[in-house]
């Protein structure tokens, strides 16, 4: 399993607008590409230096799906995000390979 993790630092003045944008526009557009099976929007807890930090995790169907997404769709979607929020929502991307997962012991 491959997780495409996008960490975004959002200015306090734009946090609510950014969350609405992600929920109503951006995430649906990303999922519409067919590259991902699900997603999570997480708030990073802890020290916040002048804003809020979020992690958006998309679980790819496969490495090939993620490769196609990053080559064919990501540039357009990232540009739309940057055009809308500029320096008020600065993102960086990480690809994670899940090597093991399982349920908690009873």
Question: Model features per residue range: what roles?
Answer:
Residues 98-106:
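Short, low-order "capping/linker" segments at domain edges
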Residues 7-13, 44:
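Short strand-loop junctions, especially beta-strand C-caps/beta-turns
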Residues 14-40, 78-79:
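Short amphipathic alpha-helical segments
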Residues 42, 96:
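Conserved S-adenosyl-L-methionine
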Residues 33-37, 52, 59-95:
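An amphipathic, aromatic/His-enriched active-site/gating alpha helix that lines ligand/cofactor pockets
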Residues 2-9, 55-56:
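Active-site-flanking beta-strand signature of metal-NTP-handling nucleotidyl enzymes
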Residues 45-49:
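A short beta-turn/loop motif at secondary-structure boundaries
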